[in-house]
Every structure is written in structure tokens, then in C-alpha cells.
Design a protein with these regions (language model features):
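Alpha-helix capping at helix-to-loop junctions
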Residues: 122, 154-157, 161
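Acidic/histidine-rich catalytic cores of soluble enzymes
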Residues: 159-198
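N-terminal pre-domain/capping segments
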Residues: 2-127, 134, 150, 195
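Extracytoplasmic/secreted envelope proteins and their assembly/folding machinery
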Residues: 54, 149-152, 180, 184
Length: 198
């Protein structure tokens, strides 16, 4: 178990160094790689109940869990007020940190956005990954970005109300944020305390 943890941490450090390019190095006087927590995205454990999931993560040496709180996830949005506290309790009882959840939130006016944000804030969870945004093929790229800029502005406002941070995960391909310059346009006027990119 310990060698797996070291492999994950060392690999993450190496990949980070490669990704950030020249001029970035780990200093022996700086952050110790052993102090970097390793979290697991729980999507692959959705077949387990909360206690079983927590036991597996603890047995495998993970420090934290990015819990799937979305359609098809461990916690369904319609059950968030009841099930998220149960999931967090099981994780924390197993010594697993729950500082982030993964959601499908991409609309501040969706019926589940506020209940999810309230539930996570009540549990002391400060970060969530929000859902993807798609381009409307009937609109130009600049028109799409202007529409999504309004979405980011509204999500920032709702996040501020609950004291949480939403991070957009960009993926390559045809989704908004695939070309990373989209994100500059969407985030340049936003407060990074409440909204950003993961």
C-alpha cells in the first residue's frame, strides 16, 4: 500500500513538472511530496454503498474523495439533503477528507443547484467541480462565449451566497473550454475566490 501511494505521488509530481514546463522544480526546502494529499474521484466506486466505498478508499491509502454528487453518482441531486451528509459521515469516519464534490451543475437556475450548494456548505465542503458546457452549433463561437459568460457570472454569484468555489473542468474536444482561451474570456472578470477552472 505504501509503495502504491509513493508511486501515485511521485507520478503526479513528475506529470506536474512536465505539464508546467521549464522553470518549475520541486525544491528540497519547499513542499514535501509526502505531504501532498491524494484524492480519488469516486465514480469508479459507485457500485458500493457509502461505508464500503469509504473502507476501500481508506484501505488503498487515499487521503480524500472527490464524491460524485450528480445524476448516476453516489449521491443523486434529488436526494442530496439526506444522502450527502450520510456519505460525508462515512468518509470522515474512515479518515477520508471530503473537501470537494463533483457535480453536473452548469445552470444557476437548475432546481438542484441551490440544494447541492447548501448541503455541501452546511457540511464544510468548499469546492465543487461543475458540469460541462456545450457550444450551440447555431451560434458563432463569440456568441456562445457571451452566453456562457453570463452563466459563469450567475454561478459566481450563487457560489458567493454559499461561500463555496466552483471549478470548471476543461476537456479537449468540442466542449466549451476545450480550447483553453475560452476560459480566459469566461473567467477574466470573475472573482477566483468563488469560480475558476480545475
Amino acid at each position: 500500500m505504501n509503495s502504491r501511494r509513493n508511486f501515485i505521488r511521485t507520478s503526479a509530481a513528475g506529470i506536474t513538472g512536465i505539464t508546467l514546463g521549464q522553470g518549475f522544480t520541486f525544491s528540497s526546502s519547499g513542499t514535501n511530496i509526502k505531504d501532498m494529499p491524494v484524492h480519488a474521484f469516486t465514480k469508479c466506486l459507485q457500485f458500493l454503498d457509502f461505508d464500503e466505498m469509504s473502507e476501500v478508499l481508506a484501505a488503498r491509502g487515499f487521503d480524500g474523495a472527490d464524491l460524485a454528487v450528480r445524476p448516476g453518482g453516489q449521491v443523486l441531486p434529488e436526494n442530496v439533503a439526506v444522502d450527502l451528509p450520510k456519505a460525508v459521515k462515512a468518509l470522515r469516519n474512515a479518515g477520508i477528507d471530503t473537501s470537494m464534490i463533483v457535480t453536473a451543475i452548469n445552470n444557476p437556475d437548475d432546481q438542484f443547484t441551490r440544494p447541492i450548494l447548501k448541503s455541501m456548505a452546511d457540511l464544510g465542503i468548499k469546492n465543487y467541480r461543475f458540469g460541462y458546457l456545450d457550444y450551440d452549433n447555431k451560434l458563432s463561437v463569440p456568441e456562445n462565449l457571451e452566453l456562457h459568460k453570463i452563466t459563469f457570472e450567475k454561478l459566481e454569484k450563487v457560489n458567493r451566497e454559499y461561500g463555496v468555489h466552483g471549478g470548471y473542468q476543461n476537456h479537449s474536444g468540442r466542449r466549451v473550454g476545450g480550447p483553453v482561451w475560452d476560459l480566459y474570456h469566461l473567467l477574466k472578470d470573475r472573482n477566483p475566490e468563488f469560480i475558476g477552472v480545475q
